[in-house]
Amino acid sequence: MIDDTLLESEERMTQSVEYAREDLTTIRTGRANPSMFNGVQAEYYGVMTPITQMATISVPEPRMLLIKPYEPSIMNAIENAIRNSDLGVNPTNDGQVLRVTVPQLTEERRKEMVRLAKSKGEDARIAIRNIRRKGMDELKRIQKDGEAGEDEVQAAEKELDKTTHEYVSQVDKLIEAKEKELMEV
């Protein structure tokens, strides 16, 4: 029972860190990055489809993306989806590919993005701590029900605290790296 509780808590903490990592990739850094289009969808045969599944996206220059649709007929749909997204970029259509120039971020916008990254990091930390709290409650229940002794439960609580600290530290490193990336000019 104790091992199951620890394992389940660790799996959920891993999921929280992965979610935070993916969430942070959506924050624009002023550099061209194909993952900035992960949330953008365009209509494709009547179905909303991520543009990452409709085209190849490459980075020929640090601040430019090339989007080459698999079918030329969907060029306008992709172009409109990018224009209507909240990414703040404007694609140029040359008939074969879409060119997207990523504008340089202003200092104020960079600081705003850092605040957003820190906020997302704090959300991940809170999620990890909530997982810890649920794990601790479960360990106390196990002890109360007589399924494990006090020493075993205390050892498991220490292990859960150690695991929590490791995962919070991973989130801190992600935020630190994102902040460094954002503040680079």
UniProtKB/Swiss-Prot annotation:
Matching InterPro entries: Ribosome_recyc_fac, Ribosome_recyc_fac_dom, RRF_sf
Single GO term (MF): ribosomal large subunit binding
Coiled coil: none
Keyword Cytoplasm found: yes
Alphabetical keyword list: Cytoplasm, Protein biosynthesis
The UniProt record lists the keyword Cytoplasm: yes
Cystines in this chain: none
Alphabetical GO biological process terms: translational termination
One GO location term (cellular component): cytoplasm
Function: Responsible for the release of ribosomes from messenger RNA at the termination of protein biosynthesis. May increase the efficiency of translation by recycling ribosomes from one round of translation to another.
Family classification: Belongs to the RRF family.
Identification of the protein by name: Ribosome-recycling factor
Native organism taxonomy: Bacteria, Bacillati, Actinomycetota, Actinomycetes, Mycobacteriales
